[in-house]
A protein has these predicted regions:
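N-terminal presequence-like segments and the immediate start of the first folded domain
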Residues: 1-321, 327-381
């Protein structure tokens, strides 16, 4: 087995860790750190989470460098500034109000690698260098344009200019995006319109390809921010390394119902495969909500859909390194937590409050998988 899962206990926090190791110099870790006492004030919960992170990178994960972090907060207006001041790690950081539903105020997902060089690139994207590749991460991009459509259009324009500075394009190099939409029921339509229009100008169509993505409810500390974008691109990636996942027995193309993202993307290297599964809900291959108003059946159908996408990349849930689970209704948390704990105990995951883009979907999940492969015609990671 190249994958290993462990849980570490700390003072007032715990961490679930997934490690990928295949004998090469780059090990990969996904870590989900949770505060374990909802009674503590926010400052102490933040201190506990950051303390757990620091102990990990000085101990079990020594030598690993953070390449991307996402903070899930219960009240960004009162909490985000403290994160910015307290965490000075040199990596892309995403900070979003999506309350952890275990009753705590903060959770942290961290993606780390060993033997890579990191730093801020000339474009403002965070660069992770190894071999022939530069992995370009960005978190918490936002602006103050008049509405969600204008904000998203400006986000794409700015990101496109950053990619051009890196001698990249959206079509050839961008692998994954996330959009966090303040009041998703009201503002998601504007995000969709802006993305559809911008993709068309960049040659991203139903006849070429789109980009794996999550579009979900979430808010920044400033209520005027209606659309926040996180993104990941790879400078140096070759077209033959990238494959898109469809699972057409279970899901339809998103363009069938007017949106433009891929269900999943796999990226092949000589020694490993990365699989990025987009936000996935209880949908069928006609684009319909399956099992309306039934959280248990929707959860099972969502898992089945994700399994079908993973299988297309010759992966399964054992290869999944992290999961983020989004719930529309906080009242569903205990039931969903029990289901996840029964099936995925020890796997790095977090369940947060974040309405899905269509009201009928009660739950959505996204994940990343890592699998050892032997593909000598592909470039080394």
């Amino acid at each position: 087995m190249n994958n290993k899962q462990q849980t570490f206990q700390f003072e007032n926090a715990f961490a679930d860790v997934f490690m990928f190791e295949n004998g090469t110099e780059v090990r990969e870790y996904h870590v989900m750190i949770h505060a374990n006492s909802s009674r503590l004030p926010y400052a102490q919960q933040l201190e506990a989470v950051l303390g757990a992170y620091n102990q990990l990178i000085e101990g079990e994960l020594v030598g690993a460098q953070a390449v991307f972090k996402r903070y899930f907060l219960s009240d960004a207006a009162n909490q985000a500034d403290d994160v910015i001041v307290s965490d000075v790690t040199d990596c892309a950081k995403s900070i979003i109000q999506q309350a952890p539903l275990d009753g705590t105020k903060i959770a942290l997902w961290v993606y780390l690698m060993t033997n890579v060089q990191t730093g801020l690139s000339k474009s403002g994207l965070y660069e992770v260098r190894h071999g022939d590749f530069r992995h370009l991460w960005n978190g918490s991009a936002h602006n103050m344009a008049a509405n969600s459509e204008y904000q998203t259009r400006l986000l794409f324009n700015e990101y496109n200019m950053q990619l051009i500075q890196e001698e990249c394009t959206l079509e050839a190099n961008c692998i994954r995006t996330w959009f966090f939409v303040n009041d998703v029921d009201l503002n998601y339509g504007g995000v969709v319109r802006a993305r559809n229009q911008f993709f068309f100008t960049q040659g991203l169509t139903v006849n070429t390809h789109f980009i794996a993505s999550t579009g979900i409810g979430g808010r920044q500390q400033d209520p005027n921010v209606l659309s926040q974008m996180d993104n990941y691109a790879i400078a140096g990636i070759r077209k033959e390394q990238v494959h898109y996942l469809y699972a057409s027995t279970h899901l339809n193309r998103t363009s069938d119902y007017g949106v433009s993202f891929e269900r999943g993307t796999q990226v092949n290297y000589a020694d490993r495969r990365h699989v990025f599964i987009s936000g996935t809900a209880s949908i069928n291959n006609k684009g319909e909500v399956v099992y309306p108003k039934d959280i248990i059946k929707q959860t099972h159908r969502m898992w089945e859909n994700v399994e079908a996408l993973l299988a297309e990349a010759d992966c399964n849930f054992n290869d999944v390194a992290e999961m983020v689970v989004y719930l529309r209704d906080t009242a569903d948390y205990e039931l969903v937590r029990e289901m996840y704990e029964e099936r995925f105990a020890g796997k790095p995951y977090v369940i947060v409050h974040a309405p899905v883009c269509r009201p009928g979907w009660l739950i959505e999940m996204e994940c990343m998988a890592i699998k050892a492969v032997d593909l000598p015609t592909m470039p080394k990671f």
